[in-house]
């Protein structure tokens, strides 16, 4: 035994250099060290596994796979080798192989606690709850620990609520009932030990809607002993479900006495008061209804009067009570006072805080438009700043800002004439500059300027004017103002978000990309806020620039997927049952994120559009994508909308904003766009697969000749193509019948239109439908092939003419307004080139295949002559010639597009710089450089786009010219 221990220590010392090199990222050195060690000890499994890891990190995937497979086949049992193999399989996302590893190891060592624990966690990663339960019970029998017992309990719970049988109510009931009995057995035996175990029991009871039992356990001695820190919200929830409103009311009064600024408690308290009103009146309690609300008012007033420092909570609660009483047609003014006076009082106390606007906005929908505007005027008077005066201090400035924001929310700016709006804009600029110079000195780089909201409001006003006049000059001026603010207040993300939005509206991808990078969006924000940029990149005119942004986003999702699995595993290791469902739901939301699925799909389309090498290299790139045309991998009914649409602050009129409807409409349209793009990619993939099928896993023949694709596989590819083609035309028919409306663009903060209407307007449907027929005819040699070649050729001409015509229109618009329709024009050009680029790649694949086939001479048998009535298939040689003719035609059309793009003029600003500088009224030394820099960004963005599009066309011309 001592000798064995000495050998283990010796091997660990020899493995140390490999581990050290892998840890610092020196993978090549790690590979050399592992090979050096294996020359001396060729049977050392851990060294072989480390070699496989080094190869994996060097990108030598096939060698790595072979090395790891050889080690796995030896069925190792030592912890070091198993850990290295597990790490490799996690990197490769082959989680089932980790399960197999530990299954073999456990068979050799059935009672090994550590191996069983690893096997359990491996089942956790693949969400096999039934297997989890079995292994957990094995563990408990081997080592009777509470943790293992409750692993089996939670596994039973998850079988009931998340497993494959969870949709069957009877099965769900059986599993949850079993889990409850398992815990109760432990309780009877006096083995319940921790607060997480108590939480799990409560959770099981609530899942079965046994709320009375849950309440009794929560308020019992055992729970008080094990779970003294049970969240109060758990009591709220149970009391509400059980209808114990009086008890809830008393509990909330106690809590509010202790913590007087809890707005969430106040809302629950007021709700309990109104629920008490609905209870049947008992004998001797005829004044109960009146008492309930008057007691509520007295309680709130008592908190206000007795508080040393003024806190928002009770004042907001009083407004909430007033609002609810009016909704129930109760005499609110008589009991509490005039609503306007309450709001003005709240404003006078708390308007020096930026949250005041949002607070007051909560209660505006409950009053009429006339009352809202009257209230807005009262608040402007209360701020103490008139049209002829400036704020005297920072607090007064914040009050004025709050009053202006509420005024806009009340609709005060909607009906103003344009000259009044322009005067208002000028006043806002003046207030911004005054506030910046007076109260914004010596700010830290991380602080926002106190007067920045004036500029944000000004940008919204200028958008209103631009929309009325259908001109870009006012909005361009707003963009320049925002860039000026950003120079003074580098951390104001509201300014960055609005600037990003305006750059996208004007089709300036370079400016948008700079703002997006300036926002420094990281981690989960790539999912919740990435939509502000990534969803606007497809068909923006810069395929490689878009691809880089997709890479950043997808890298987060890929890395976080592995991290999320480990977080879930850790919740089991530490028995944190209260967090398990939260982590599992979080994992599912990210896995099914619309942002992730869209970026992944558009990245694949970008790669196919941008292919520039020879046909065999391009086919290798295509093969790596692993597109399965017959399989729709998107879980459409589980797609998750994780966008944070409140990230961009807004003060638009409340009666004209329906945020929920806007979210739903945009999400529905984005899903339809995703369906179109996904189906287009799968349909296109069938074109390629029909002529270059995916590699067959069977070994190649001994004589070295290529193995031909079996006839059933060809028939399957053909039927898949026909099926997807029908789905393609059917989807377009359905979308036209759905008659989706473009997203409203009434305000600056509204989401930009989706690509749905653009994709319906452009000839995508006809182009790919006719292309599908051409591919089928080329494959079968149908007699109608020549006619379909002409039809496809006509489509190519139409797409080329669309591209040229759009560029000509853009140049004409430059004489009027070069920015207002710029984004739409760029999208049409990019879409045209996308279709032509995909067509060029397909023709190169067809030509390569047909050239090889046409050289193979087929000898006819003597009895194989057919009658003249039977149409003969077009010969391989003729098909090859037809494809080459299509390539020649495409080459000329691509050259025509290139010539048109050469003439595409950069956007011209609608007015000269001196006119803009006169309107900006900012510091003279700043104005020239500021507006010049913004103008240069537009020019550089156009030049980058033209260069990239021309390079794309040159690659495609080279591709079809070979």
Curated annotation (Swiss-Prot):
Keywords on record: Antimicrobial, Immunity, Innate immunity, Lysosome, Repeat, TPR repeat
Ligase recorded as keyword: no
GO cellular component terms, A-Z: lysosome; NatB complex
SUPFAM superfamilies with a match to the protein in the record: TPR-like
Compartmental location: Lysosome
InterPro entries named among the record's database cross-references: NAA25_NatB_aux_su, TPR-like_helical_dom_sf
TPR repeats: 45-78, 79-112, 523-560
One GO process term, biological-process aspect: phagocytosis, engulfment
A Pfam short name: NatB_MDM20
Presence of keyword Repeat: yes
Span list, region Disordered: 856-880
Family: Belongs to the MDM20/NAA25 family.
Function comment: Non-catalytic subunit of the NatB complex which catalyzes acetylation of the N-terminal methionine residues of proteins beginning with Met-Asp or Met-Glu. Has 2 roles in the larval immune response: required both for the phagocytic degradation of internalized bacteria and for the induction of Defensin in the fat body. Within the phagocytic blood cells, has a role in detection of infection and activation of the humoral immune response.
Assembly and oligomerization: Component of the N-terminal acetyltransferase B (NatB) complex.
UniProt-listed PANTHER family: N-ALPHA-ACETYLTRANSFERASE 25, NATB AUXILIARY SUBUNIT, N-TERMINAL ACETYLTRANSFERASE-RELATED
Name recorded for this polypeptide: Phagocyte signaling-impaired protein
Gene coding for it: psidin
């Amino acid at each position: 035994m001592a000798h064995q221990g000495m050998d283990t220590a010796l091997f660990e010392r020899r493995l140390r250099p490999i581990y050290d090199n892998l840890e610092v990222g020196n993978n090549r050195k790690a590979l050399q060290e592992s090979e050096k060690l294996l020359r001396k000890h060729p049977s050392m499994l851990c060294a072989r596994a480390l070699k496989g890891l080094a190869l994996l990190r060097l990108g030598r995937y096939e060698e790595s796979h072979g090395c790891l497979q050889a080690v796995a086949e030896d069925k190792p049992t030592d912890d070091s080798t198993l850990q290295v193999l597990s790490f490799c399989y996690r990197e490769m996302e082959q989680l089932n192989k980790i399960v197999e590893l530990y299954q073999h190891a456990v068979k050799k060592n059935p009672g090994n606690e550590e191996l069983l624990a690893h096997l359990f966690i491996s089942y956790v990663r693949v969400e096999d709850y039934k297997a989890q339960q079995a292994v957990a019970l094995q563990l408990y029998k081997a080592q009777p620990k509470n943790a293992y017992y409750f692993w089996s309990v939670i596994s039973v719970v998850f079988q009931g609520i998340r497993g494959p049988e969870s949709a069957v109510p009877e099965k769900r009931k059986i599993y949850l009932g079993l889990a409850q009995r398992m815990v109760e057995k432990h309780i009877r035996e006096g083995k319940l030990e921790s607060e997480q175990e108590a939480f799990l029991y409560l959770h099981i009871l609530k899942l079965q809607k046994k709320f009375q039992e849950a309440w009794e356990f929560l308020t019992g001695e055992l729970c008080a002993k094990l779970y003294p820190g049970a969240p109060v919200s758990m009591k709220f929830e149970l009391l509400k479900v059980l209808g114990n409103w009086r008890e809830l009311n008393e509990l909330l009064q106690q809590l509010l006495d202790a913590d007087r600024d809890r707005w969430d408690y106040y809302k629950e308290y007021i709700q309990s008061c109104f629920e008490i009103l609905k209870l049947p009146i008992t004998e001797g309690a005829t004044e109960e209804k009146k008492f309930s609300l008057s007691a509520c008012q007295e309680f709130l007033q008592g908190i206000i009067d007795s508080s040393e420092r003024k806190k928002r909570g009770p004042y907001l609660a009083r407004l909430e009570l007033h609002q609810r009483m009016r909704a129930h047609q109760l005499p609110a003014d008589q009991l509490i006072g005039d609503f306007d006076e309450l709001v003005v009082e709240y404003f006078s106390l708390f308007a020096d805080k930026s949250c005041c606007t949002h607070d007051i906005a909560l209660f505006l929908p409950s009053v009429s438009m006339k009352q809202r505007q009257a209230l807005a005027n009262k608040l402007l008077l209360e701020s103490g700043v008139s049209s002829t005066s400036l704020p005297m201090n920072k607090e007064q400035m914040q009050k004025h800002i709050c009053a202006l924001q509420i005024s806009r929310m009340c609709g005060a700016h909607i009906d103003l004439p344009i000259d009044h709006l322009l005067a208002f804009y000028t006043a806002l600029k003046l207030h911004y500059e005054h506030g910046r110079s007076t109260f914004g000195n010596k700010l830290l780089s991380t602080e926002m300027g106190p007067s920045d909201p004036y500029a944000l409001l000004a940008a919204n006003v200028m958008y209103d004017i631009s929309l009325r006049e259908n001109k870009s000059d006012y909005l361009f001026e707003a963009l320049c103002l925002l860039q000026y603010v950003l120079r003074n207040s580098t951390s104001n993300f509201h300014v960055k978000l609005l600037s990003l939005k305006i750059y996208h509206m004007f089709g300036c991808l370079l400016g948008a990309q700079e703002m997006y990078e300036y926002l420094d969006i990281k981690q989960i924000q790539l999912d919740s806020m990435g939509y502000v940029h990534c969803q606007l990149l497809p068909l923006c005119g810069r395929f490689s620039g878009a691809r880089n942004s997709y890479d950043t986003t997808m890298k987060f999702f890929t890395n976080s997927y592995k991290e999320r699995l480990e977080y879930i595993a850790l919740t089991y290791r530490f028995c944190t049952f209260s967090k398990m469902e939260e982590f599992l739901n979080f994992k599912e939301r990210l896995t099914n994120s619309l942002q992730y699925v869209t970026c992944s799909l558009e990245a694949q389309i970008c790669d196919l559009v941008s292919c520039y090498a020879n046909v065999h290299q391009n086919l290798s790139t295509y093969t790596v994508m692993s597109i399965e045309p017959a399989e729709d991998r998107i879980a459409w009914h589980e797609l998750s909308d994780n966008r944070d649409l409140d990230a961009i602050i807004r003060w638009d009129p409340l009666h004209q904003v329906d945020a929920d409807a806007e979210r739903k409409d945009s999400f529905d349209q984005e899903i339809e766009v995703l369906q179109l793009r996904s189906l287009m990619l799968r349909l296109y993939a069938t074109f390629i697969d029909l002529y270059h099928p995916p590699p067959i896993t069977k070994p190649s023949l001994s004589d070295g000749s290529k193995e031909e694709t079996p006839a059933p596989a060809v028939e399957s590819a053909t039927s898949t193509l026909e099926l997807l083609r029908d789905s393609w035309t059917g989807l377009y028919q359905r979308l036209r019948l759905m008659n989706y409306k473009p997203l409203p663009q009434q305000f600056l903060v509204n989401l930009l239109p989706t690509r749905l209407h653009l994709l319906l307007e452009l000839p995508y449907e006809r182009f790919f439908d006719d292309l599908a027929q051409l591919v089928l005819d080329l494959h079968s040699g149908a007699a109608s092939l020549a006619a379909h070649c002409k039809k496809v050729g006509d489509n190519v001409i139409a797409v080329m003419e669309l591209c040229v015509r759009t560029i000509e229109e853009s140049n004409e618009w430059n004489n009027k307004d070069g920015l207002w329709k710029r984004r739409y024009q760029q999208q049409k050009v990019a879409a045209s080139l996308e279709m032509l680029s995909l067509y060029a790649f397909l023709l190169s694949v067809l030509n390569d295949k047909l050239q090889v086939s046409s050289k193979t001479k087929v000898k006819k048998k003597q009895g194989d002559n057919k009658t003249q009535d039977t149409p003969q298939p077009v010969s391989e040689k003729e098909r090859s010639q037809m494809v080459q003719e299509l390539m020649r035609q495409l080459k000329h059309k691509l050259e025509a597009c290139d010539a048109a793009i050469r003439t595409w003029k950069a956007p011209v600003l609608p007015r000269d710089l001196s006119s803009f500088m006169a309107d900006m009224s900012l510091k003279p030394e700043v104005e020239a450089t500021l507006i010049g820099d913004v103008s240069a960004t537009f020019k550089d963005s156009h030049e980058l786009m033209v260069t990239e599009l021309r390079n794309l066309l040159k690659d495609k011309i080279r591709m079809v010219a070979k």
